[in-house]
């Protein structure tokens, strides 16, 4: 029996579509030697805030951190339950657990997914 191996995600395929822009900007950040905070981050946060029409925005290192910050901003924590779909990346449940809440999985509707 042959086992079909399906990768969890294919970041290489996604990267290839934006390679030129990513490479240019990564080199700009590396050249500045400011990988955390610094002018590049300030500029990104300013432009992103303007783009989405808010006064303040914060960039984070990954989606897990973003979810944790969002949950904390909503006051979600110990003893709370958060309803989510199991059809998601594992950091969704991880983030809910990280703030002390309990993930509650519900199915999605096939016709509205």
Regions found by a protein language model. Give the residues of each.
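Conserved PLP-binding active-site segment in aminotransferase class I/II-type PLP enzymes
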Residues: 1-73, 77-78, 99
């Amino acid at each position: 029996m042959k086992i079909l191996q399906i990768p969890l995600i294919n970041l290489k395929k996604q990267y290839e579509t934006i390679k030129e822009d990513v490479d240019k900007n990564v080199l700009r950040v590396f050249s500045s030697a400011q990988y955390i905070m610094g002018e590049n981050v300030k500029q990104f946060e300013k432009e992103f805030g303007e783009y989405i029409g808010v006064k303040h925005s914060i960039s984070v290192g990954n989606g897990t951190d973003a979810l944790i910050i969002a949950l904390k901003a909503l006051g979600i924590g110990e003893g709370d339950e958060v309803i989510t779909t199991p059809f998601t990346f594992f950091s969704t449940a991880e983030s809910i657990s990280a703030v002390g809440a309990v993930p509650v999985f519900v199915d999605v509707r096939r016709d509205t997914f």
